[in-house]
């Protein structure tokens, strides 16, 4: 990814943090100016998102970005970087380990997913369990209150299912191996670049960002004004920066 060790890592969630919907082209230009300035000082920047890699690249184009990130963490756990031919490829062997562990994870927790579907049918009929090639196990629900109730039930089941983890973002939830999330993926990027948490910045706005908004991952923490209350409170409790502006402008 780089010819020399960077001076710092800047890592942003995408939707709701780095970009708004719709985005303001002037705000994007301001952000790119700052990222360019930081790049000249040796920093690298990347996106840490629940989107797939290709959906993220489409999003960058849609929101008018001219800068290319130094790395992208997709689906909250897959790590990519542009090679010398500007093609996006795996960064190290993390993705192969991630795929291997998740294949075992979904098989080992198939009984839990069946139990969950029965529970949803009897308690939250509006919730939908998702299972396909793109998303082996996930949920979409009508509103945040229902999601909170379901997450409370899932949390009560965790002691009986070692390795069970999930990534919650608004009305969407993705089940994952407990060892793979935005925080652990960013730590892997740090390890490969030989950068400590004291030179790492992370910003996010939703529940799935909490795993990277920790001091063992990044000492510089921030969230935009549109962050969910739980994230704002968490960042504030760790002495992080709570922007008074939403999304892109909050990162400028």
Predicted regions and their residues:
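The start of beta-strands in P-loop NTPase/AAA+ ATPase cores
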Residues: 8-10, 70, 200
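Active-site phosphate-binding/coordination module
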Residues: 29-122
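Active-site metal-binding loops of divalent metal-dependent hydrolases
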Residues: 18, 77, 204-206
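Conserved acidic, metal-coordinating active-site core of Asp-based
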Residues: 113-201, 207-215
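Short glycine-/acidic-enriched loop or helix-start segments at secondary-structure transitions
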Residues: 21-22, 56-58, 83-84, 212, ...
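A generic structural motif
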Residues: 40-44, 162-164, 218
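Mg2+-dependent phosphoryl-transfer enzymes with acidic/Ser/Thr/Gly-rich catalytic loops
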Residues: 5, 176, 183-252
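Asp-based phosphoryl-transfer active-site loop
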Residues: 3-24, 213
């Amino acid at each position: 990814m780089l010819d020399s060790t960077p001076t710092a890592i800047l890592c942003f969630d995408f939707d709701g943090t780095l970009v708004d919907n719709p985005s303001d082209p002037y705000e994007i230009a301001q952000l790119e100016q700052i990222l360019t300035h930081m790049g000249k000082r040796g920093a690298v920047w990347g996106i840490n998102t629940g989107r797939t890699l290709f959906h993220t690249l489409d999003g960058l184009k849609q929101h008018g970005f001219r800068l290319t990130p130094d790395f992208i963490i997709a689906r909250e756990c897959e790590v990519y970087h542009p090679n010398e031919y500007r093609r996006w490829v795996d960064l190290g062997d993390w993705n192969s380990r991630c795929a291997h562990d998740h294949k075992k994870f979904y098989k080992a927790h198939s009984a839990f997913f069946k139990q969950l579907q029965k529970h949803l049918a009897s308690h939250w009929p509006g919730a939908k369990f998702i299972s396909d090639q793109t998303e082996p196990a996930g949920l979409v629900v009508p509103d945040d209150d229902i999601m909170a109730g379901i997450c409370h039930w899932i949390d009560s089941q965790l002691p009986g299912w070692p390795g069970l983890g999930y990534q919650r973002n608004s009305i969407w939830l993705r089940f994952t191996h407990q060892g793979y999330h935005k925080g652990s993926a960013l730590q892997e990027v740090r390890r490969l670049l030989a950068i400590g948490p004291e030179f790492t910045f992370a910003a996010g706005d939703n529940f799935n960002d909490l795993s990277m908004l920790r001091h063992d991952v990044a000492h510089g923490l921030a969230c935009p004004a549109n962050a969910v209350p739980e994230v704002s409170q968490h960042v504030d409790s760790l002495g992080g920066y709570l922007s008074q502006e939403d999304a892109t402008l909050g990162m400028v």
